[in-house]
């Protein structure tokens, strides 16, 4: 159970962090 919850937690974190990084990179390129 711990491995499954940690896997989903990591997946959720990746899905939330990746768009934030892409948005920050796009803002840097616009400037």
Swiss-Prot record:
It comes from the Eukaryota. It is a single-pass membrane protein. GO terms for cellular component: chloroplast thylakoid membrane; cytochrome b6f complex. It holds the Pfam family PetL. GO terms for molecular function: electron transporter, transferring electrons within cytochrome b6/f complex of photosystem II activity. Its main location: plastid. Keywords: Chloroplast, Electron transport, Membrane, Photosynthesis, Plastid, Thylakoid, Transmembrane, Transmembrane helix, Transport. InterPro entries: Cyt_b6/f_cplx_su6. The chain crosses the membrane at residues 4-26. It is found in: Plastid, Chloroplast thylakoid membrane. GO terms for biological process: photosynthesis. The keyword Transport applies. The keyword Electron transport applies. Component of the cytochrome b6-f complex, which mediates electron transfer between photosystem II (PSII) and photosystem I (PSI), cyclic electron flow around PSI, and state transitions. PetL is important for photoautotrophic growth as well as for electron transfer efficiency and stability of the cytochrome b6-f complex. Belongs to the PetL family. The 4 large subunits of the cytochrome b6-f complex are cytochrome b6, subunit IV (17 kDa polypeptide, PetD), cytochrome f and the Rieske protein, while the 4 small subunits are PetG, PetL, PetM and PetN. The complex functions as a dimer. This is Cytochrome b6-f complex subunit 6. It comes from Dioscorea elephantipes (Elephant's foot yam).
């Amino acid at each position: 159970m711990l491995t499954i919850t940690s896997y989903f937690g990591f997946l959720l974190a990746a899905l939330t962090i990746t768009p934030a990084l892409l948005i920050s990179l796009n803002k840097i390129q616009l400037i």
